[in-house]
Amino acid sequence: MQLSRALYRNLNTRHWNRRIWEVGYRGPILPQQKATGRPDYPVSANRVNILRERLAREQIVMNLLTRPYSTAYAELTYLETEKNVKSLEELRAKEYKKLDEQRMPGKPKNTEGSKSTIRKKANVGNLLHTHTTVEDSLAGLAARKRWD
């Protein structure tokens, strides 16, 4: 009996038994307030409606960002006026052609394998003209097997 009473007693009695008229009482303890997930001010129906409106507006904006052109006609108009192309495929071909013209002649050869293999077979000139990213510069650190 004593054991079960000791095991099942309220461990929160110090806070449970506090009274409003005690000096320094400021409401429930902070973890208890946070556990409810409610804000510490009264929420009116008007505030809820405002939040609903804002969330609906945000949803509309997110939809517009994922699909910037609502119709194929609008997209075609943009491509013709801004990019001077007739279709998306033509724009892609134009971009690929531009990239191909930027690099050195000859396709980059095999760059996989050991250092000696790369030096023998790789066209290093083409590799000099690629933009080095942060990932490329940290590749050596990522490949290391040391634990320091």
UniProtKB/Swiss-Prot annotation:
Lineage: Eukaryota, Metazoa, Ecdysozoa, Nematoda, Chromadorea
Protein name per Swiss-Prot or TrEMBL: Uncharacterized protein ZK1236.5
Biased composition (Basic and acidic residues): 97-112
Domain of life according to the entry: Eukaryota
Originating organism: Caenorhabditis elegans
Region (Disordered): 97-126
